[in-house]
Structures are given as structure tokens and as C-alpha cells.
From Swiss-Prot:
Identification of the protein by name: Putative leucine-rich repeat protein PS14
Miscellaneous comment: On the 2D-gel the determined pI of this protein is: 5.7, its MW is: 22.8 kDa.
Top-rank lineage group of the source organism: Eukaryota
Organism: Pinus strobus
Amino acid sequence: CSDGLKGLNALGTLPRKGLNALGTLPWVDLYN
């Protein structure tokens, strides 16, 4: 993961992962 994507994922704007697509796991990118 990258810091940039991590920041956007915190807002649930980048559904890179299945669960994050729903914006329910904004921290998931930290583990992927």
C-alpha cells in the first residue's frame, strides 16, 4: 500500500479491497 492510497482509503474513496468498497474498513489498506 502507499501513504497516498491509505489517506484516501481512510475516507472510503478507494475501494481497493472487497470490504473497503463499502467504506466499512478504512484501515484495511494498512494490512494490504
